[in-house]
């Protein structure tokens, strides 16, 4: 609204920009707060992400007709999230006197993921005149581990004490939440083929 005043005479952002009171006198009306005021506060809204990935492969002819191919890859990821709003933030303007000490909030989250994939295939090929033997033996191994947690706290009367440990309590009726799960996969393969004169297969 271009007609709403959002700064005082000194050029500072004001906290409350407008108040609506019904003409009929019914209801309590509504107060509108200035979101620009929050820019003057010490707030935190950060997300960080680290990712390390590596791939390795080998292709080795051990002897004529015998060949080994293998690969290995892994990924390690870390995520960090932090969100802090002090007690004077407009999000808490309508808190009742009973919840006065709950004003201010900090949400911290952490996550970690580690996964790897390893595989190898040994191939054998032999031929004599019209006789051909072909064999393959291989395996595959995968694992994925994920851990994550979130902590929601409240009660930050001093905006300069902006670390989660300065909270007065966990979120009302809340508790730290997290999850951890692991998945694994193992596979094997093998085959043996014989052919004669490129017409008869076994």
Regions found by a protein language model. Name each.
Residues 61-63, 127-129, 197:
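Outer-membrane beta-barrel channels and translocator barrels
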């Amino acid at each position: 609204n271009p007609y709403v005043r959002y700064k005082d005479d000194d050029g500072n952002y004001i906290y409350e920009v407008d108040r609506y009171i019904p003409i009929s006198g019914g209801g309590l009306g509504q107060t509108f707060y200035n979101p620009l005021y929050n820019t003057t506060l010490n707030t935190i809204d950060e997300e960080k992400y680290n990712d390390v990935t590596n791939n390795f492969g080998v292709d080795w002819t051990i002897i004529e007709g015998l060949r080994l191919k293998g690969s290995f890859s892994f990924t390690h990821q870390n995520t960090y999230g932090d969100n802090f709003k002090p007690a004077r933030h407009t999000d808490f303007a309508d808190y009742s006197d009973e919840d006065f000490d709950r004003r201010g909030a900090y949400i911290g989250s952490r996550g970690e993921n580690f996964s790897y994939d390893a595989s190898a295939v040994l191939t054998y090929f032999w031929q004599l005149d019209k006789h051909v033997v072909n064999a393959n033996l291989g395996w595959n191994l995968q694992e994925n581990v994920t851990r994550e947690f979130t902590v929601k706290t409240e009660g930050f009367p001093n905006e300069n004490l902006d670390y989660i440990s300065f909270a007065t309590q966990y979120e009302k009726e809340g508790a730290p939440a997290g999850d951890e799960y692991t998945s694994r996969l193992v596979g094997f393969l093998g085959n043996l083929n014989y052919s004669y004169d490129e017409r008869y297969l076994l």
